[in-house]
Amino acid sequence: MGEFKVHRVRFFNYVPSGIRCVAYNNQSNRLAVSRTDGTVEIYNLSANYFQEKFFPGHESRATEALCWAEGQRLFSAGLNGEIMEYDLQALNIKYAMDAFGGPIWSMAASPSGSQLLVGCEDGSVKLFQITPDKIQFERNFDRQKSRILSLSWHPSGTHIAAGSIDYISVFDVKSGSAVHKMIVDRQYMGVSKRKCIVWGVAFLSDGTIISVDSAGKVQFWDSATGTLVKSHLIANADVQSIAVADQEDSFVVGTAEGTVFHFQLVPVTSNSSEKQWVRTKPFQHHTHDVRTVAHSPTALISGGTDTHLVFRPLMEKVEVKNYDAALRKITFPHRCLISCSKKRQLLLFQFAHHLELWRLGSTVATGKNGDTLPLSKNADHLLHLKTKGPENIICSCISPCGSWIAYSTVSRFFLYRLNYEHDNISLKRVSKMPAFLRSALQILFSEDSTKLFVASNQGALHIVQLSGGSFKHLHAFQPQSGTVEAMCLLAVSPDGNWLAASGTSAGVHVYNVKQLKLHCTVPAYNFPVTAMAIAPNTNNLVIAHSDQQVFEYSIPDKQYTDWSRTVQKQGFHHLWLQRDTPITHISFHPKRPMHILLHDAYMFCIIDKSLPLPNDKTLLYNPFPPTNESDVIRRRTAHAFKISKIYKPLLFMDLLDERTLVAVERPLDDIIAQLPPPIKKKKFGT
């Protein structure tokens, strides 16, 4: 692997927002996740659980409900009283409609997907018809005395259940009238509570309604008679969420204590046809409230205040050992929040509402391999750039020379010129940005910092010439297919001649920057692109996909390289393919053209294309790389993959020069330390 001086950075104080709600789409096997800052993320569970899309948050959009309807249409609602639909191609909000019922606490799509229900602060339940372009208000149901906190349709679509404070209502959909009102027991551990909040309801085909509430109970109701059938006290705190499997043979609930409980419908005796609900498995994968749960055919999904998105596999449902067979926790976004100015040794950190610019520390000390060297000069926090307005930052970038910073929100694009005088820094905003640069999904500077490449949310790729403190728009590449396809990843060649762009359809287009035309399109692949980069000298495009495959494509020759064909013929090591975090960054060594540097959240890897590929019998994570020419045994076992797991969780890693690396880590304990305290539990013997 070689020896590097490594800047080990741990001052990126990034804390993901907590998870508020999730919605699973069985047709597409995708999961929508809403966070407390209003951000909505889309995970493709068929593509190794990759976060393929996201919609940036907004301070006034506290999302309380999320659901899929009409197959691939995604809706959300929140405390601002609006219902929103998302454009999954252009990655923006199609429209927002006021429901005129105050804050919205719950939402559910009908079994047919053609209707949408919302539960409001004023006690109203509103029914909307889903039309091809929008949603249309149909009618109100009988208004209740308190806010509607949870909703569930009967699978036939004829009735709905609505959870409120102290009671559950059953409505007839055709008439909109309440046919039953079931009072929830306020008793908690023998003491009568002031209020009992019904956080979740689930309406089953046989007419059973399952409710979860703030008294720590899971209760079963007969909707035909409006009576309580059975009650389970499972927690000393709120049971906040519930999700039922499509087959209605199991369901999952989440509690404020961080525990997830699995219930299954099992026969009363081995030969009996009669079945009953039994609590079978408790799981403790969270430290804080489990605010939301989902149930896929093969896993229990949960999320909450501790920011983790947890997939717990149901091993009896997993047929073969694959991506679905592993417990996984997703904490960090599958995109890069850090950019680097190698020339000035600067790091730009992206947060939701501000940017931070840091200069790396330095040392004059020397030592042997593995030593930690004392700093002669500490890292400097040079700049804190706060956004104006309620919108989250979508993307940001600092130029390689360190003289430009660009970032974008949903409605505005910002470009700044930086000037350095000794230890002082001055910032000047470039004014009068053109209207077509209103918003960007991805930003990238050329290696010489003279050009800025901007992927707009309308599918166009803009090239901007930078000179002094001004800019000039050179060209715009329009979407190839005629439809708006958001470009999520950009890569530019070091010589500035080639620009690669990857869109939401997993295709990669390569443009000739000098001739301002499309050069070629990389052959389509079934899995999304997670990272890509263009190598110096050869102009080979290296592409990493969510299934852990890595391809090398020759841009001048418009074909895969011989090395890439060899890799696809022989195949990657099975341990490499079983990794559950995507590659998020690729770079190259300036003096070693055969080396590819890449990393995910838990490993840093150098691929040496001059060495043979490891087979499945070879030790992939080889702890003994060759140290000198006489080390014959080690050289015989050497293979192309040199992997280090020292740095983790690893959010960014890149070469500053041929002998220096920078690694940005974010320990999970540091994140948990900044979260609100969890519910205090009494331990035995204390």
Curated annotation (Swiss-Prot):
Which PROSITE patterns does the UniProt record give? WD_REPEATS_REGION
| Record's subcellular location | Nucleus, Nucleolus; Chromosome
Please provide, in alphabetical order, the Gene Ontology terms of the cellular component aspect for this entry: 90S preribosome; chromosome; fibrillar center; nucleolus; nucleoplasm; small-subunit processome; t-UTP complex
In its UniProt record, which GO terms are filed under biological process? maturation of SSU-rRNA; maturation of SSU-rRNA from tricistronic rRNA transcript (SSU-rRNA, 5.8S rRNA, LSU-rRNA); regulation of DNA-templated transcription; ribosomal small subunit biogenesis
The cross-references to Pfam families, in alphabetical order and at most eight, read: WD40 (PF00400)
Give the position of the cross-link Glycyl lysine isopeptide (Lys-Gly) (interchain with G-Cter in SUMO2).
321
| Free-text description of this protein's post-translational modifications in UniProt | May be phosphorylated during mitosis; may control the association of this protein with WRD43 and UTP15.
SUPFAM superfamilies named among the record's database cross-references? DPP6 N-terminal domain-like (SSF82171), WD40 repeat-like (SSF50978)
Q: One MF term from GO for this chain?
A: RNA binding
For this protein, the record's SMART domains field holds: WD40
Positions of WD repeats? 7-50, 51-92, 93-135, 136-181, 182-226, 227-275, 276-317, 318-377, 378-427, 428-475, 476-516, 517-566, 567-627, 628-666
UniProt keyword list? Chromosome, Isopeptide bond, Nucleus, Phosphoprotein, Repeat, Ribosome biogenesis, rRNA processing, Transcription, Transcription regulation, Ubl conjugation, WD repeat
Spell out the Gene3D superfamilies in the cross-references.
YVTN repeat-like/Quinoprotein amine dehydrogenase (2.130.10.10)
Functional note: Ribosome biogenesis factor. Involved in nucleolar processing of pre-18S ribosomal RNA. Part of the small subunit (SSU) processome, first precursor of the small eukaryotic ribosomal subunit. During the assembly of the SSU processome in the nucleolus, many ribosome biogenesis factors, an RNA chaperone and ribosomal proteins associate with the nascent pre-rRNA and work in concert to generate RNA folding, modifications, rearrangements and cleavage as well as targeted d Involved in SSU pre-rRNA processing at sites A', A0, 1 and 2b.
Q: How does it assemble?
A: Interacts with HIVEP1 Interacts with NOL11. Part of the small subunit (SSU) processome, composed of more than 70 proteins and the RNA chaperone small nucleolar RNA (snoRNA) U3. May be a component of the proposed t-UTP subcomplex of the ribosomal small subunit (SSU) processome containing at least UTP4, WDR43, HEATR1, UTP15, WDR75.
PANTHER family linked to this entry: U3 SMALL NUCLEOLAR RNA-ASSOCIATED PROTEIN 4 HOMOLOG
Protein name in the entry: U3 small nucleolar RNA-associated protein 4 homolog
Q: Native species of this protein? A: Homo sapiens (Human)
